[in-house]
Amino acid sequence: PPPNPEGTRQARRNRRRRWRERQRQIRSIGAWILSTYLGRSAEPVPLQLPPLERLTLDCEEDCGTSGTQGVGSPQVLVESPAVLEQGTKE
């Protein structure tokens, strides 16, 4: 969580500085884990989604029932590219 906004100006400044340093360290550790163990960069890969017109809900079950039954799962009518394989090195 972000630092507490209480205290003197100097105390707030020090807390913000320490918090930013912790966030920087967390990001660098995450990038190291991604590059070392998963073989990909920490930069986000753009996710390619199909157009909304090609999405449909599979409603073979009763759609009028309550709860999670009958909701169906979104299905893509055309083949989508293998997005997950883009970030791997072979």
Curated annotation (Swiss-Prot):
Motif (Nuclear export signal and binding to XPO1): 47-58
Residue span of region Disordered: 1-22
PTM description: Phosphorylated by protein kinase CK2. Presence of, and maybe binding to the N-terminus of the regulatory beta subunit of CK2 is necessary for CK2-mediated Rev's phosphorylation. Asymmetrically arginine dimethylated at one site by host PRMT6. Methylation impairs the RNA-binding activity and export of viral RNA from the nucleus to the cytoplasm.
Phosphoserine found at: S66, S73
Keywords: AIDS, Host cytoplasm, Host nucleus, Host-virus interaction, Methylation, mRNA transport, Phosphoprotein, RNA-binding, Transport
Motif (Nuclear localization signal and RNA-binding (RRE)): 8-24
Disulfide pattern: none
Pfam families per record: REV
Single GO MF descriptor: DNA-binding transcription factor activity
Chief location: host cell
Basic residues biased stretches: 10-21
GO biological process, one term: mRNA transport
GO cellular component, one term: host cell nucleolus
Chain segments annotated as transmembrane: none
Subcellular location: Host nucleus, Host nucleolus; Host cytoplasm
Domain of life, per lineage: Viruses
Quaternary state and interactors: Homomultimer; when bound to the RRE. Multimeric assembly is essential for activity and may involve XPO1. Binds to human KPNB1, XPO1, TNPO1, RANBP5 and IPO7.
Function: Escorts unspliced or incompletely spliced viral pre-mRNAs (late transcripts) out of the nucleus of infected cells. These pre-mRNAs carry a recognition sequence called Rev responsive element (RRE) located in the env gene, that is not present in fully spliced viral mRNAs (early transcripts). This function is essential since most viral proteins are translated from unspliced or partially spliced pre-mRNAs which cannot exit the nucleus by the pathway used by fully processed cellular mRNAs. Rev itself is translated from a fully spliced mRNA that readily exits the nucleus.
Entry's free-text remark on domains: The RNA-binding motif binds to the RRE, a 240 bp stem-and-loop structure present in incompletely spliced viral pre-mRNAs. This region also contains the NLS which mediates nuclear localization via KPNB1 binding and, when the N-terminal sequence is present, nucleolar targeting. These overlapping functions prevent Rev bound to RRE from undesirable return to the nucleus. When Rev binds the RRE, the NLS becomes masked while the NES remains accessible. The leucine-rich NES mediates binding to human XPO1.
Something else known: Isolates WMJ1, WMJ2, and WMJ3 were obtained from blood samples sequentially taken from a two-year old Haitian who was perinatally infected by her mother.
Name of protein: Protein Rev
Protein source organism: Human immunodeficiency virus type 1 group M subtype B (isolate WMJ22)
